[in-house]
């Protein structure tokens, strides 16, 4: 949730737990479209978070929990401080215990009115709260309890929220993500520099025209729009965590068109950079 250099995020889970678990305290962040080879679970405890999963936009608030499937494009925006439980479970780890994982997606509708599903979701969130407690307190032998709770969570995820999908769809989606992965990695390494269309198309081993169509189809925006949104994520972070002048921050992250920056910033955050800083008492 908190902004860091992400496009295709590599989840390096600790060997003693095989998952990444933490209580996220986010002062404010914007993370553009990215994905990781892990199931991501976000359970809001304070504040709110704007989320986009593929083409669906929604806001989660205190008490809401969402499950984002692995290899699914998503973005998040936190415009005021929030606190959440964040759990990322690598697909490689899950596949050891769920052999048909590649044919499944997990449907966890936090807005459901179905009482049976609400009860199952409450049980799921209770395990997350127990994980948080044991992770914070860490008594002797805490890993025994922590890992047992992870397996209980996976059992519930598999039995209560898994839905089978067509194998052909998942196979093509994996091929597309494998092609997109080096592109987003390249952008994360060179986003401060001008990147030409021909340059980035070569990374994907595609002709420029086809690359444009492919990128827009998969990401929902053009390559240039994505590059500017990626820059914007770091600009927003620096804006709310430093006193550096706006023009210095823009130059640091390679955003050279100030007029375009102001328009994009206003569209994303509803205020000018000066207004955002005043709200956060940075000025």
Where are these predicted regions, by residue range?
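Basic/polar phosphate-binding segments, predominantly the helix-turn-helix DNA-binding elements
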Residues: 188, 194-232, 244, 250-279
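A hydrophobic/aromatic-rich effector-binding and dimerization subdomain
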Residues: 2-22, 70-136, 154-166
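Short, Lys/Arg-enriched, Trp-marked, Pro/Gly-tolerant hinge/linker segments that flank
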Residues: 110-120, 135-146, 155-189, 193, ...
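Generic protein-terminus/edge-of-domain signal
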Residues: 1-61, 65, 72, 78, ...
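Hydrophobic alpha-helical connector segments
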Residues: 150, 245-246
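Solvent-exposed, amphipathic alpha-helical segments
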Residues: 47, 123-137, 179-190, 234, ...
